[in-house]
């Protein structure tokens, strides 16, 4: 089987490898006209009588059940908790303290004969209400609050990225499974027709119109066709089971054929510019850059003085020095020398910022490569589909001519086998080319930041989930 690109998508490579393996096992024989009639009739009956499953339904199920989405949602909840934690550092602290103390003896001062002032009772209690508020901490709590807000936005963007990537994975599995099932139908009909040709060859041998070599050749062809059918059927079943596990659906209906997926307009450069603006990864990077810059400022804040205020109301059993009082204390701490700790933390934060800035170059280059690959891949896949369609038509006509020639003795069984082999190859290539064209269209939408499926809006799904 011929690849339509030097580097096709991985799932297409697997499908092509399976097709090549099938071709090495099964060699020849297939009346193309009958194949088209039986395949179309079987597909129509299956989609009419059985339950149909669309790609959109599979994607929605995967988004609702896959653990990667749950992990992304968990990261959002953690980021939300971090926001509350950072906000709490700005708020005041209120504590109520109490204690009950037993002393070995009572201590008192004799003021006059018969009159004493107890300064330490044998049993004493006290309680206080304390309010502490940071007045200035080098703006570090405010920086931390802004960083937590950015991390929350990053977590939400990461979830959107996960959704797009999972959608692309489901689409690849869906199209691969659909192509595998169509390949099974091709091989099934081919096997039936080859078995029919074997019966014809045996009857012709009985009347002396064919040799024993012709019969042996058709018997070998039947054996190869049976083996090819078993192989492709097993591959299709595995692909179907894998798709069911990926999407969280126990029983899949018949996979509804995916219509032409619309692609975004514009040339490669225009689409790359669009991707730089709309890709979730770029939006995430902008937040990471801002957060890294704030982290440098946060670490620099440790050079600045710290000012705290503490208000307290205190009450005790003892009357010494008083049974109750209120106080307000301002505490100022000026860092003089900390062993180079702050300077080292600032240097680390600056390097983190530098790495994020370098990541911008890497990400832009990666996105540009993805868009170029998807853009060129779609053009190649579309051309390959046209070529496969023409090849199928040509193989159909060639088989008809060869079959007529074989009937009148102008062509041998080897010639008929060759023409039917070409028909099988052409139809299999057509199936894979059609699936690859749709996958490349979905990949192109994904590469520029659009939701891969045009009929599924992420915003609606996210709103429904909340």
Where do the protein language model's features map onto the residues?
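Amphipathic alpha-helical coiled-coil scaffold segments and their short linker/junction regions
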Residues: 57-63, 249-309, 341, 453-466
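Periplasmic alpha-helical coiled-coil/stalk elements that build and connect Gram-negative outer-membrane
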Residues: 53, 162-274, 374-377, 381, ...
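Bacterial N-terminal signal peptides
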Residues: 31-41
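Small/polar-residue-enriched beta-strand and adjacent coil segments characteristic
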Residues: 52-54, 93-161, 283-364, 374-377, ...
